[in-house]
């Protein structure tokens, strides 16, 4: 037979459960659970700022550390595209475009983990502008859906529609280009 819980005991049980839930949430928040900021991104592991050197179209060196711009994939330095039946060094052009975007202006980067090559994965800004988004919107990088939430898909669509950067040429997806080169070697 079922026992009936007295009304006062039921209130204490409910209140105790509520207190436990609130304390658990606070413990996760303050003791290092996957803390989320307002956009839903993980908080960065660390921030780094200063003048950067361009390595290629999606990689920078800042304070001696290589940083990969998170969420984009630009043509590799040795990669060529085709325009009007002629090869175009689109990897070098992408790197030059990135260099033009940052110039000597300081960058503020939020580093969020590392890639398989040990480079810090970073979201970098200069003068309030998201560098990866600008590279994608200008057509010199693709939104990298494999490792991002599609954050730059709209910028890529705008570049494609406007035939900007590599979208004005015939090109191979940088990830496919790298895979083909690995298979050939």
Regions found by a protein language model. Give the residues of each.
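Small beta-barrel nucleic-acid-binding modules, primarily SNase/OB-fold domains
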Residues: 1-185
């Amino acid at each position: 037979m079922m026992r009936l819980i007295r009304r006062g005991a039921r209130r204490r049980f409910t209140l105790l459960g509520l207190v436990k839930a609130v304390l658990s949430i606070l413990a996760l928040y303050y003791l290092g659970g996957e803390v989320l900021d307002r956009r839903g991104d993980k908080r960065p592991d660390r921030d780094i700022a200063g003048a950067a050197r361009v390595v290629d179209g999606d990689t920078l060196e800042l304070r001696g550390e290589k940083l990969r711009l998170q969420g984009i994939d630009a043509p590799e330095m040795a990669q060529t595209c085709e325009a009007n039946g002629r090869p175009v060094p689109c990897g070098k052009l992408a790197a030059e475009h990135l260099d033009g975007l940052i110039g000597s202006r300081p960058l503020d980067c939020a580093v969020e983990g590392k890639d398989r090559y040990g480079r810090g994965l970073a979201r970098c800004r200069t003068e309030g502008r998201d560098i990866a988004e600008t590279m994608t919107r200008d057509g010199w990088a693709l939104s990298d859906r494999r490792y991002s939430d599609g954050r730059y898909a709209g910028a890529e669509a705008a570049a494609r529609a406007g035939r900007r950067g590599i979208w004005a040429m015939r090109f191979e997806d940088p990830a496919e280009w790298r895979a083909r080169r690995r298979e050939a070697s």
